[in-house]
Amino acid sequence: MLHNIKSSDSSHPLKGSWWGLLCAAFFFISCEGSSPTLDHPSTMQKSAKRGVSFNFTNIQDLPLLSPAISWSYNWANDQNSTSALWFDTNAMDFCPMCWNGSYSADKIRQYVQQHPNTKYLLGFNEPNLTDQCNMTPAQAAGPWQEVVALAKELNLKLISPAMNYGTLAGYHDPIKWFDEFFALPNVSLDDIHAIAIHCYMASPSAVKDYIKKFEKYGKPIWMTEFCAWDPVPSNVEKQMDYMCSVLNHMEQNPHVERYAWFMPRTSGKVDSPPYMQLLTHGSPVELTPLGQIFTQFSSFDKNAYLALDKGVGAHQYIALKDESISLRVTDNNQLYIQSFMQGQWIDYHVHVQSKQPLQIQYASIVNSQVCISIDGVAQAIVDLPKTSDLQTITTLTTTVIPPFGNHTLRLEALKGTFNCYQLRQ
């Protein structure tokens, strides 16, 4: 059942005139700064923040991840030539790293010379962990001066040592390590572009609080390792919920400049704890369901107005009320919102170029209801009758006919809960 709030005809004062419709379409397009060719995308630009911490040794991995990631690092001074070529031709940024004081400056120089688009140099890896870099602030300060000099020589932006909760006596707290390090007379915050941190806490709220701690340094934040691992998730669905909540936060957090998932593949089985692998083993390599979520996840690209007549995936939102909104994957690798429930809302940027009613693809085992708004104005309250089960996807045609041009379309759940798959005309 549809409860009209605003007549769809009122948006078209020139209804009935082909010339009027063309003028109206041109007016909307011109006002929104869109291309008059009506050639609008069906996907967003990939996220400039999204990356992985991973050593690409299998050529099959690159085309699966490169459409979604903008950068990567492998804890080393350089990467193999095959990966480097792929990075150069697919708008991906590789970041060399000085893992500890024993790095090879010559290897880094050679890599930067061969790949002049290299922009960043990563600092020491977890110096407050005894099984990693294992250095006190005072011990790190000496070799750090050489790293600073190398970054300046190569015109690279320098990223701080990457900190986690540690095992080094007296330095469990990464903030304590950083505070002492930056207070040393031969160390300066001015030498670094960003603060690097790692986090394996399985609670998304704990991750968000952890990120906030490092805002005190007034630098962009790079989360260069993260996944849910402490405590270990009981299944991959828990890892999916974690990923969605944390990515929803970091993509929208202006303090987070980059993040890198740990990691796309390990030596363990894909279906073994902590269930964080993005790629399968063997050949041909495929994305795991978690990998599908990671690569298709919204980049919150507010410049893209997706063609509504081509279908807008429910996961392609540009704003949302609740960061805990989670995604799942169908058998044909389509993402959908799981359990969209009362009190939650999601915004989409859509481009309309046909006078057709809005359709919603969904599944639900309870009767549900949503309010549809366009550009902040409620258009209709729509009843979503329950389907026979959550595997039965239903397409409901509403009476809402969006006006031509670019618009912000909001779905707000008023009652019930349902899985949402797609919006289209």
Identify the residue ranges that each predicted region occupies:
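N-terminal carbohydrate-binding/catalytic regions of secreted carbohydrate-active enzymes
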Residues: 49-119
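Aromatic- and acid-rich polysaccharide-binding/catalytic face
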Residues: 96, 125, 177-212, 217-230, ...
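Active-site clefts of carbohydrate-active enzymes
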Residues: 166-169, 217-243, 262-280
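Aromatic-rich peripheral "rim/lid" segments of glycoside hydrolase catalytic domains that contact
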Residues: 95, 262-311
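Active-site groove signature of glycoside hydrolases
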Residues: 115-137, 159-168, 190-199, 257-265
